[in-house]
Amino acid sequence: HLWETWLPKKFKEKGPRVERRRLGEMLWVGGSKMYEYELDTPDAPWCDIWFYEDLVYPNKRHVAAVGFAREEMTMSPITYDEMRPGCYEPKARVEDMISNHVEASLSFPTMPRFCGQTFAEAEDRELALACVKAYNDFMVEEWCGDSNGALLPLIIIPLWDADLAAA
Protein backbone atom coordinates (compact mmCIF):
# COMPACT_ATOMS: atom_id res chain seq x y z
CA HIS A 1 0.00 0.00 0.00
CA LEU A 2 2.72 2.52 0.95
CA TRP A 3 4.49 2.45 -2.41
CA GLU A 4 1.33 2.16 -4.52
CA THR A 5 -0.15 5.20 -2.77
CA TRP A 6 2.79 7.48 -2.01
CA LEU A 7 5.37 6.82 -4.74
CA PRO A 8 5.01 9.12 -7.80
CA LYS A 9 3.43 7.38 -10.79
CA LYS A 10 6.61 7.41 -12.89
CA PHE A 11 8.39 5.25 -10.26
CA LYS A 12 5.64 2.78 -9.34
CA GLU A 13 6.64 0.08 -11.82
CA LYS A 14 10.26 0.04 -10.56
CA GLY A 15 9.47 0.77 -6.91
CA PRO A 16 9.29 -1.72 -4.04
CA ARG A 17 6.62 -4.38 -4.41
CA VAL A 18 5.39 -7.47 -2.57
CA GLU A 19 4.86 -10.82 -4.24
CA ARG A 20 3.48 -13.93 -2.58
CA ARG A 21 5.85 -16.75 -3.50
CA ARG A 22 7.01 -20.05 -2.07
CA LEU A 23 10.22 -19.61 -0.12
CA GLY A 24 12.61 -22.50 0.29
CA GLU A 25 15.85 -22.51 2.22
CA MET A 26 17.45 -19.25 3.37
CA LEU A 27 21.23 -19.21 3.45
CA TRP A 28 23.13 -16.60 5.50
CA VAL A 29 25.84 -14.98 3.34
CA GLY A 30 26.47 -11.78 5.33
CA GLY A 31 27.14 -8.28 4.06
CA SER A 32 24.45 -6.02 2.67
CA LYS A 33 22.85 -8.96 0.83
CA MET A 34 22.59 -10.94 4.11
CA TYR A 35 20.79 -14.01 2.69
CA GLU A 36 20.39 -16.04 -0.45
CA TYR A 37 17.01 -17.61 -1.05
CA GLU A 38 15.48 -20.47 -2.95
CA LEU A 39 12.34 -19.02 -4.50
CA ASP A 40 9.37 -20.94 -5.89
CA THR A 41 10.43 -24.21 -4.29
CA PRO A 42 7.55 -26.69 -4.68
CA ASP A 43 5.82 -27.46 -1.37
CA ALA A 44 7.81 -24.73 0.45
CA PRO A 45 5.84 -22.37 2.69
CA TRP A 46 4.22 -19.28 1.22
CA CYS A 47 5.83 -15.95 1.99
CA ASP A 48 5.12 -12.32 1.19
CA ILE A 49 8.40 -11.11 -0.26
CA TRP A 50 9.58 -7.58 -0.94
CA PHE A 51 11.41 -6.98 -4.22
CA TYR A 52 13.32 -3.79 -5.01
CA GLU A 53 16.06 -3.63 -7.63
CA ASP A 54 18.16 -6.72 -6.80
CA LEU A 55 16.93 -6.91 -3.19
CA VAL A 56 14.86 -9.91 -2.16
CA TYR A 57 13.47 -9.36 1.36
CA PRO A 58 11.11 -12.04 2.68
CA ASN A 59 8.86 -11.29 5.61
CA LYS A 60 9.97 -13.50 8.48
CA ARG A 61 7.97 -14.48 11.53
CA HIS A 62 10.42 -13.01 14.06
CA VAL A 63 9.76 -9.53 12.63
CA ALA A 64 6.00 -9.87 13.15
CA ALA A 65 6.08 -12.18 16.16
CA VAL A 66 3.18 -10.72 18.13
CA GLY A 67 0.60 -13.41 18.84
CA PHE A 68 3.00 -16.30 18.36
CA ALA A 69 4.37 -18.44 21.18
CA ARG A 70 8.06 -17.90 21.99
CA GLU A 71 9.08 -21.15 20.28
CA GLU A 72 7.27 -19.98 17.12
CA MET A 73 9.35 -16.77 16.86
CA THR A 74 11.60 -18.04 14.12
CA MET A 75 13.10 -16.98 10.81
CA SER A 76 10.24 -18.85 9.10
CA PRO A 77 8.51 -17.23 6.12
CA ILE A 78 5.23 -15.44 6.84
CA THR A 79 2.47 -13.80 4.81
CA TYR A 80 0.53 -10.68 5.75
CA ASP A 81 -2.53 -12.91 6.21
CA GLU A 82 -0.72 -14.67 9.07
CA MET A 83 0.32 -11.42 10.79
CA ARG A 84 -1.70 -9.55 13.33
CA PRO A 85 -3.12 -6.43 11.55
CA GLY A 86 -1.40 -4.19 14.11
CA CYS A 87 1.87 -5.08 12.37
CA TYR A 88 0.86 -3.16 9.24
CA GLU A 89 -2.31 -1.11 9.91
CA PRO A 90 -1.94 2.01 12.10
CA LYS A 91 -5.43 1.96 13.66
CA ALA A 92 -5.05 -1.72 14.58
CA ARG A 93 -1.58 -0.92 15.96
CA VAL A 94 -3.00 1.75 18.27
CA GLU A 95 -5.76 -0.64 19.42
CA ASP A 96 -3.10 -3.24 20.26
CA MET A 97 -1.09 -0.61 22.12
CA ILE A 98 -4.11 0.46 24.18
CA SER A 99 -4.88 -3.15 25.14
CA ASN A 100 -1.25 -3.56 26.20
CA HIS A 101 -1.13 -0.23 28.12
CA VAL A 102 1.47 1.28 25.76
CA GLU A 103 1.26 5.07 25.40
CA ALA A 104 3.52 5.63 22.41
CA SER A 105 5.46 3.66 19.84
CA LEU A 106 8.30 4.39 17.44
CA SER A 107 8.07 2.05 14.44
CA PHE A 108 11.32 1.15 12.70
CA PRO A 109 11.20 0.33 8.98
CA THR A 110 11.68 -3.27 7.87
CA MET A 111 12.25 -3.51 4.12
CA PRO A 112 13.97 -0.08 3.96
CA ARG A 113 16.02 -1.26 6.98
CA PHE A 114 16.50 0.74 10.17
CA CYS A 115 17.87 3.94 8.65
CA GLY A 116 17.05 3.48 4.97
CA GLN A 117 20.15 1.51 3.94
CA THR A 118 18.10 -0.28 1.26
CA PHE A 119 17.80 2.98 -0.64
CA ALA A 120 21.37 4.11 0.12
CA GLU A 121 22.61 0.89 -1.53
CA ALA A 122 20.31 1.27 -4.56
CA GLU A 123 21.62 1.78 -8.09
CA ASP A 124 18.92 4.22 -9.22
CA ARG A 125 19.40 7.29 -7.00
CA GLU A 126 16.42 9.15 -8.43
CA LEU A 127 14.13 6.23 -7.59
CA ALA A 128 15.81 5.82 -4.20
CA LEU A 129 15.18 9.47 -3.32
CA ALA A 130 11.56 9.15 -4.43
CA CYS A 131 11.25 6.08 -2.16
CA VAL A 132 12.73 7.96 0.80
CA LYS A 133 10.29 10.84 0.27
CA ALA A 134 7.33 8.47 -0.19
CA TYR A 135 8.24 6.55 2.96
CA ASN A 136 8.54 9.75 5.00
CA ASP A 137 5.26 11.18 3.68
CA PHE A 138 3.50 7.91 4.50
CA MET A 139 5.09 7.75 7.96
CA VAL A 140 4.08 11.30 8.94
CA GLU A 141 0.73 11.63 7.17
CA GLU A 142 -0.77 8.14 7.20
CA TRP A 143 0.96 5.92 9.76
CA CYS A 144 1.19 8.53 12.53
CA GLY A 145 -1.29 11.17 11.33
CA ASP A 146 -4.48 10.02 13.06
CA SER A 147 -2.87 8.34 16.06
CA ASN A 148 -3.22 11.26 18.49
CA GLY A 149 0.49 11.08 19.22
CA ALA A 150 0.52 7.35 19.99
CA LEU A 151 2.57 6.54 16.87
CA LEU A 152 5.75 8.58 16.57
CA PRO A 153 7.20 9.17 13.10
CA LEU A 154 10.65 7.80 12.39
CA ILE A 155 11.75 9.13 9.04
CA ILE A 156 14.70 8.03 6.93
CA ILE A 157 17.19 10.21 5.08
CA PRO A 158 19.12 9.87 1.82
CA LEU A 159 22.33 8.60 3.40
CA TRP A 160 24.24 8.81 0.10
CA ASP A 161 24.09 12.63 -0.07
CA ALA A 162 24.86 14.88 2.91
CA ASP A 163 23.23 17.94 1.30
CA LEU A 164 20.01 16.05 0.56
CA ALA A 165 20.06 14.56 4.07
CA ALA A 166 20.41 18.02 5.63
CA ALA A 167 17.67 19.58 3.46
PLM features: residue spans?
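Helix-coil boundary/capping segments in enzymes
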Residues: 1-167
